[in-house]
UniProtKB/Swiss-Prot annotation:
Residues that bind Mn(2+): D148, E150, E219
Gene3D superfamilies: 1.10.1740.10, NAD(P)-binding Rossmann-like Domain (3.40.50.720)
Keyword Metal-binding part of the UniProt annotation: yes
One Pfam family of this chain: DXP_redisom_C
Pathway: Isoprenoid biosynthesis; isopentenyl diphosphate biosynthesis via DXP pathway; isopentenyl diphosphate from 1-deoxy-D-xylulose 5-phosphate: step 1/6
Name by which UniProt lists this protein: 1-deoxy-D-xylulose 5-phosphate reductoisomerase
Keywords in alphabetical order: Isoprene biosynthesis, Manganese, Metal-binding, NADP, Oxidoreductase
Length: 383
């Protein structure tokens, strides 16, 4: 039995993680969970899974929870510290970090200090502070197990292989909601159109990131840290069907690929059961004859400028990826609220990157300060 702490239980990854836990009551038990402010979603989860600890970001949600009559005694906390409390909860073996945004960084570090196995779905943890997280993981001898389908695919392809034999990583990308549109057609696109992803069921922020290809850019930075591979050896390949989740090419030009129908529960479950596997009854088998053909296209950095920003930020390193991430979070939020157009997301990010003076080897405090400065700068443009 593995005891789970789930950070971000009411989000897309959180809900699919709960589905995996639900299908394997003999293997997993939810001991702790956190959520933001969606108390209507949280209460049924608490009642079904009966975690010992529940944390929420919103004080209002916390008071609603406190006023609810549960059939058992549950510990509760509110605010930013709640994620940390859940991450270091004593009875937990595995922490699933399904938080969205840079808020996921500190809970990850605290969980590593307590030698919890990390199942990482929060890209921003490695994007903003990859050098610190990797050093923590090495110091405390804690595995970082990827939950993203692309990184899980690479992780699976590398089982039994030696890192020294890797030629390059090939990270696949669906192309997002606007993959069939020319760049000139993007100016007037709506939020509703952007949120209509052709392949995956995801949260709003990551769906917009997929449309701009920033999501893939963040995944490139994440892959750099997870697998210790230079950016020059990480390629992005457009693949509309999302059947090949990623590939690894070795020095002898052999290529290993991991395939499957688009279902986030598969990589989530693999992270929870690793190094074993378990049946996933509701997952669909891959019948290639039904698909007929798979399509591929080279990523166009002029078409997807956010992908270019991510590669350049990663190569520069230091605090630049933290700026990239903070500016993107602010810009995407502004787009979702109707304050900027789709293409203005790129413009805001570029302005933030161009004004930043990089700190080469930042401390955690430096990263926090740069994050806040960047958000304040973008906000000053928006107001």
């Amino acid at each position: 039995m593995r005891y789970i702490s789930l950070l971000g239980a009411t989000g897309s990854i959180g809900e699919q993680t709960l589905d995996v836990i639900r299908q394997h009551p003999d293997k997993f038990k939810l001991k702790a969970m956190t959520f933001g402010r969606n108390v209507d979603k949280a209460i049924p989860i608490i009642e079904q899974f009966q975690p010992e600890f529940v944390g929420c970001l919103s004080e209002e949600a916390y008071h609603t929870l406190k006023g609810h009559s549960f059939e058992y005694d549950v510990k509760m906390a509110a605010g930013d510290e709640a994620n940390i409390e859940a991450a270091i909860y004593d009875a937990v073996d595995v922490v699933v970090n399904a938080l969205v945004g840079s808020v996921g960084l500190v809970p990850t570090l605290k969980a590593i200090e307590q030698k919890k196995t990390i199942a990482l779905a929060n890209k921003e943890t490695l994007v903003t502070a990859g050098h610190i997280v990797k050093e923590y993981a090495k110091t405390y001898d804690v595995p970082l197990l990827p939950v993203d389908s692309e990184h899980s695919a690479i992780f699976q392809c590398l089982q039994g292989e030696q890192a020294k034999n890797i030629e390059r990583l090939i990270v696949t990308a669906s192309g997002g909601s606007f993959r069939d549109k020319k760049r000139t057609e993007l100016e007037g696109v709506t939020v509703e159109e952007a949120l209509n992803h052709p392949n995956w069921s995801m949260g709003a922020k990551i769906t917009i990131d997929s449309a701009t290809m920033m999501n893939k850019g963040l995944e490139v930075i994440e892959a750099h840290w997870l697998f210790d591979i230079p950016y020059e050896q990480i390629d992005v390949l457009l693949h509309k069907e999302s059947i090949i989740h990623s590939m690894v090419e070795f020095h002898d030009k052999s290529v290993m690929a991991q395939l499957g129908t688009p279902d986030m529960r598969v990589p989530i479950q693999y992270a929870l059961t690793y190094p074993d596997r378990a049946p996933l009854p509701e997952a669909k088998s891959l019948n290639l004859w039904e698909i007929g053909q798979l399509n591929f296209q080279k990523a166009d950095f002029d078409r997807y400028r956010c992908l270019h920003f991510a590669y350049e930020s990663g190569k520069i390193g230091g605090t630049m990826p933290a700026v990239l991430n903070a500016a993107n979070e602010m810009a995407v939020d502004a787009f979702l609220k109707g304050k900027v157009t789709f293409l203005q997301i790129e413009e805001l990010i570029e302005k933030a990157l161009n004004r930043h003076h990089v700190i080469s080897t930042p401390s955690l405090q430096d990263i926090h300060e740069v994050d806040k400065e960047t958000r304040d700068f973008v906000q000053s443009i928006l107001t």
